[in-house]
């Protein structure tokens, strides 16, 4: 007798567990400029990420080139912090001691003094003509075509402003007219005069406050711009002017380690000594640029490339760690005499002071790779005596303006403030998200229009979902049976989430993420439309989950601020939720009342009431940031939208209707012209149509048909056949015309 299964052995223990087949989760890879490839990202200590970013040199307004780097790094920082959940410690510097700042501060000070001195008109004319001599020499010596073109534009403007003042002086014009011409010349010649005044008097400036006022002002403007762009503030902000003692100590240790040398009160880094060291490599980022004297001299600064300065170096490839100050330059005490820091050493000393001997990430613009970042790496590794000061070097791509190179020195740039006059900070950020952070971004009307349309597309989806979620139901009514459409949409949702995660792991590929999000919304829109056709209510919980996820991703990217659960904030991130929850119940009541009135008005054909209802929808409520959408047979949809957005939509609609009407009128006018031309042609008798063309034909038969050309040669059979067809067509047209005349149907 066999045992029953209850008595069988081994049945009281669990069976072996069958593990699912799982694909290994992708890890985050970042494009590392040190290897020029995507590398798996591993912080050096647990989940903490130490990050240093090169900040601005503050001597002028921040422009879209700055925005390219700082918005892009802000996105990367937020993704690492809020998506991958790293503990990011972010340090950024402000360069407030630099050749550009010194020169600009001197020029601004001297030009302001010159303007305030109110020079006589004849003196101004003479000074501008004198300043033109070295300026024209500078143009002739400039090889860069873009820079040459910029200088020539200045020369043209100055020359155009010179002539009226000269003419007015020759004619003894009145004081008011002379003053007007002088002001025009002063404005046109500001760059030219500033250079000339600096050459004459720059060395006489000894007041250090002149060199601190300029960067202090522009740093303040920079922070305002970053706040307007919703860029996170750094955890630590370092200013060069506050770190001079640390920089001096940093330079001294490099000298002590044998990689620096003193020359005429300045200190230089020996690139040869460093490169020959067994444990070091010079120019890790761009080794092929070693010896590029143009790039090296740009890195040294305009005030540091004179013949006497360059002769102090042991090698042209060496660079300044400490610069002996000349007259007219700010200075600080050091073991080598009064001087100021070199550009590259500033970042090394400040970053080293905060982050130590090695950091996880260093970021900056693509154009900083050589010599700035390569020199940073060399001097820092010489100081710390290691070969890993930076583990991952990230460089944001260039920014072009409508396909053209952007350059502050070439005066071809758009300030951040100007850009924010045309588009919102969110739209700018969306434009950046729709492109790879490491590739060139073209800032153009097409680029921004794509971002605006993306924002509108997402916003309409969020507004539609919010409207669906507001439909009254009890809590159990929110949960309905899932049919095939819901299962398919949910599968699509999770597929898109996986694709988005994979894209973020792949060098934080926001471009792909944005496309996947757009595709997901398109699927949702198709689902909602299918439900509408079937006269079924869409699944709220599924749409809530998807829209909440999309909102959370846009929050990660910094495109949404505040506590908004679904969609973009309305009326500012702080009061968005309160505004919507407060006013929406009243708007719903108003909408329902309006719908009831419209139904009665339609039944009784009261057109005046229907017109008032349309006026409320089209003109009154948009002024308050409310959009009503009427759908035949369905409840009116109520949407809260920014007032400016609605008014812009209204204006665009008006322009579109005007354009449509203009095209309609143009088509009618063309049709009328064509009909008039046809009528005129119909009036011509076939016997006259060729006889008028004496430049082509010389002889005709009795019906007016041509037989010979202008030279008296008889027409060929082919020509005759072709002309006969035209003749017969005209016969038919003229016959129709005669019939119209007989019937009285022509004017």
Curated annotation (Swiss-Prot):
Entry annotated with the keyword Cytoplasm: yes
Ranges of Basic and acidic residues composition bias in the record: 651-683
Assigned protein family: Belongs to the class-I aminoacyl-tRNA synthetase family.
Molecular function GO terms recorded: ATP binding; cysteine-tRNA ligase activity; metal ion binding; tRNA binding
UniProt biased composition (Polar residues): 15-25
Catalytic activity: tRNA(Cys) + L-cysteine + ATP = L-cysteinyl-tRNA(Cys) + AMP + diphosphate
Name by which UniProt lists this protein: Cysteine--tRNA ligase, cytoplasmic
Gene3D superfamilies registered for this protein in UniProt: HUPs
Motif ('HIGH' region): 56-66
């Amino acid at each position: 007798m066999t045992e029953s299964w209850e008595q069988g052995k081994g049945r009281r223990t669990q069976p072996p567990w069958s593990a699912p087949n799982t694909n290994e989760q992708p890890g985050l890879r970042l494009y590392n400029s040190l290897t020029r490839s995507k590398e798996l990202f591993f912080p050096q200590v647990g989940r903490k990420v130490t990050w240093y970013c090169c900040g601005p040199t503050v001597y002028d307004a921040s422009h879209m080139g700055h925005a390219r780097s700082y918005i892009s790094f802000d996105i990367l920082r937020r993704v690492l912090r809020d998506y991958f959940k790293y503990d990011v410690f972010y340090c950024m510097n402000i360069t407030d001691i630099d050749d550009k700042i010194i020169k600009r501060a001197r020029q601004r000070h001297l030009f302001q003094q010159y303007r305030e001195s109110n020079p006589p008109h004849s003196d101004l004319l003479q000074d501008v003509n004198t300043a033109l001599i070295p300026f024209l020499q500078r143009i002739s010596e400039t090889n860069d075509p873009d820079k040459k073109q910029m200088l020539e534009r200045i020369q043209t403007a100055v020359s155009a402003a010179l002539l009226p003042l000269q003419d007015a002086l020759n004619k003894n014009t009145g004081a008011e007219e002379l003053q007007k011409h002088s002001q025009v010349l002063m404005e046109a010649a500001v760059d030219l005069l500033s250079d000339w005044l600096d050459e004459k008097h720059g060395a006489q400036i000894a007041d250090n406050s002149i060199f601190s006022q300029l960067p202090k002002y522009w740093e303040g403007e920079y922070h305002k711009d970053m706040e307007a762009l919703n860029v996170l503030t750094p955890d630590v902000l370092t200013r060069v002017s506050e770190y001079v003692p640390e920089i001096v100590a940093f330079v001294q240790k490099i000298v002590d380690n044998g990689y620096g040398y003193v020359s005429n009160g300045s200190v230089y880094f020996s690139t040869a000594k460093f490169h020959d060291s067994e444990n070091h490599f010079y120019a890790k980022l761009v080794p092929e640029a070693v010896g590029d004297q143009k790039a090296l001299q740009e890195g040294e600064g305009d005030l540091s490339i004179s013949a006497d300065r360059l002769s102090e170096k042991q090698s042209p490839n060496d660079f300044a760690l400490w610069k002996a100050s000349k007259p007219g330059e700010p200075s600080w005490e050091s073991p080598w005499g009064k001087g100021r820091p070199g550009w590259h050493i500033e970042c090394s000393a400040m970053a080293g002071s905060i982050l130590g001997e090695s950091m996880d990430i260093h970021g900056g613009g693509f154009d900083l790779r050589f010599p700035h970042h390569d020199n940073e790496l060399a001097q820092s590794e010489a100081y710390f005596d290691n070969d890993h000061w930076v583990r991952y070097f990230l460089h944001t791509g260039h920014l072009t303006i409508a396909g053209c190179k952007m350059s502050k020195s070439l005066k071809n740039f758009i300030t951040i403030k100007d850009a924010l006059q045309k588009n919102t900070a969110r739209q700018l950020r969306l434009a950046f998200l729709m492109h790879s952070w490491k590739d060139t971004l073209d800032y153009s009307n097409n680029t921004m229009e794509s971002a605006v349309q993306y924002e509108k597309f997402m916003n309409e989806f969020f507004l539609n979902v919010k409207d669906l979620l507001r439909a009254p139901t009890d809590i159990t009514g929110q949960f309905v049976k899932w049919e095939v459409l819901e299962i398919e949409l949910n599968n699509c949702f999770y597929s898109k989430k996986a694709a988005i995660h994979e894209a973020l792991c792949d060098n934080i590929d926001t471009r792909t993420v944005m496309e996947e999000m757009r595709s997901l919304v398109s699927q949702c829109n198709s689902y909602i439309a299918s439900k509408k056709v079937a006269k079924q209510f869409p699944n709220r919980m599924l749409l809530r989950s998807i829209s909440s996820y999309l909102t959370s991703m846009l929050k990660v990217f910094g495109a949404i601020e505040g506590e908004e659960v679904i969609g973009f904030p309305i009326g500012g991130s702080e009061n968005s939720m309160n505004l919507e929850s407060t006013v929406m119940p009243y708007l719903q009541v108003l909408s329902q009342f309006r719908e009831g009135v419209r139904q009665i008005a339609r039944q009784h054909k009261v057109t005046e009431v229907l017109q008032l209802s349309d006026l409320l929808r089209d003109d009154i409520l948009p002024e308050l940031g409310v959009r009503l959408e009427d759908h035949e047979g369905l409840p009116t949809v109520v949407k809260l939208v920014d007032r400016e957005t609605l008014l812009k939509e209204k204006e665009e609609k008006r322009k579109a209707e005007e354009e449509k009407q203009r095209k309609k009128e143009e088509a009618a006018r063309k049709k009328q012209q064509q009909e008039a031309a046809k009528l005129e042609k119909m009036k011509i008798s076939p016997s006259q149509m060729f006889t008028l063309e004496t430049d082509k034909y010389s002889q005709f038969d009795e019906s007016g048909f041509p037989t010979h050309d202008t030279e008296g040669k008889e027409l060929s059979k082919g020509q005759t056949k072709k002309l006969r067809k035209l003749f017969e067509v005209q016969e038919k047209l003229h016959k129709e015309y005669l019939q119209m005349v007989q019937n009285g149907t022509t004017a």
